[in-house]
């Protein structure tokens, strides 16, 4: 069995991996995302994912597969990561409701067994429901949107306020499982090698 390391403290990403039989070692990269200033949304999430994975990979003493991810919501050309505070989350939801956005997740898989690195991007369209200010306030009061890129969790209460997903649902949660399978295959592995 290959050692699999998740370079993220995200419980949602860990749970997605566990749901497919991968029990990762979890290392938080503590990479300072503010040190990266890239205007292109696609390049930004891929660079952040790579940096997070590299920080963790450089700390490991033994070979492993190291997965780093970074997600942002792009709405009307603007990037939204995690909200700063409840007021920010409320303001975001007031601008997001009834709109469509793109959830971008950069994925980096570093193979320390073969000294190879793959960097990929998954984009999923998210159509948000029109919800009232009262619903927004109640949702934000749960605290859930404060820990999520785009201020919503598809796999939580936030799923109530998403009308449609076009593309990969697991990508919206933080990790595209089909893309991970393709990346493992490109490196010559099967997901079962990580079970």
Curated annotation (Swiss-Prot):
- Top-rank taxon: Bacteria
| Subcellular compartments | Cytoplasm
Its recorded reaction(s) are: a ribonucleoside 5'-triphosphate + H2O = a ribonucleoside 5'-phosphate + diphosphate + H(+); a 2'-deoxyribonucleoside 5'-triphosphate + H2O = a 2'-deoxyribonucleoside 5'-phosphate + diphosphate + H(+)
Q: What is this protein called?
A: Nucleoside triphosphate pyrophosphatase
Q: Give a Pfam family name.
A: Maf
The record's EC number reads 3.6.1.9
- Active-site residues from the entry: 70 (proton acceptor)
What is the role of the protein in this entry? Nucleoside triphosphate pyrophosphatase. May have a dual role in cell division arrest and in preventing the incorporation of modified nucleotides into cellular nucleic acids.
Q: Which cofactors is this protein said to need? A: a divalent metal cation
Q: Cellular component per GO?
A: cytoplasm
- Keyword field: Cytoplasm, Hydrolase, Nucleotide metabolism
Q: Say where the protein is mainly found.
A: cytoplasm
What family does this chain come from, according to its entry?
Belongs to the Maf family.
